[in-house]
């Protein structure tokens, strides 16, 4: 609703890429008031339909970000407009930044050296070193890219908003059962 968008302290970054026979979606969210952050990544079949973006819709409805950065690769403007509506971003976000994968800052967020630097800057040296701290980041490449871009974006706009940010909670879990309208 419009009221929940006005009350949200969340900023999200959605990273979408089409590759081979699938669409990969990496998502990152920061609550700038509490410092909580979360990431999620999903793969879906390569088709442009509302059900393709169900997990994105779940993520958006759970966090209701008032500002969203959407980074796309191999998506047309029309498809981006559609997914903003499919996922409910158009109704909850007051501000949507749309970026293509060719953007310099986006290209930088793809580089592992830069990702480690950002993780170390915001979460301490242990998160920036190779080891257990980076294990989940390594297995969720697009969620990591989304978080890297989002951390830098928020820091550039107001460094105090990410001064005491907590390590991100990975919302990827396999113990959820998904029921769609046609499954009952």
Give names to the regions the model predicted.
Residues 1-184:
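Charged catalytic and DNA/RNA-contacting regions of genome-maintenance
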């Amino acid at each position: 609703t419009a009221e929940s968008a006005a009350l949200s302290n969340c900023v999200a970054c959605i990273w979408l890429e089409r590759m081979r026979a699938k669409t990969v979606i990496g998502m990152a969210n920061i609550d700038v008031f509490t410092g909580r952050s979360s990431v999620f990544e999903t793969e879906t079949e390569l088709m442009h339909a509302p059900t393709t973006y169900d997990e994105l819709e779940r993520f958006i409805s759970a966090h209701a970000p008032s500002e969203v950065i959407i980074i796309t690769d191999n998506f047309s403007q029309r498809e981006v407009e559609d997914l903003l509506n499919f996922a409910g971003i158009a109704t909850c976000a007051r501000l949507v930044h749309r970026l293509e994968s060719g953007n310099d800052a986006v290209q930088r967020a793809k580089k592992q050296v830069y990702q480690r630097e950002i993780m170390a800057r915001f979460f301490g040296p242990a998160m920036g070193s190779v080891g257990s701290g980076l294990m989940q980041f390594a297995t969720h490449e697009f969620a990591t890219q989304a978080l890297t871009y989002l951390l830098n974006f928020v820091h550039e706009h107001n460094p105090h908003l990410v001064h005491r940010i907590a390590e991100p909670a990975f919302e990827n879990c396999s113990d959820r059962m998904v029921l769609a309208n046609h499954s009952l």
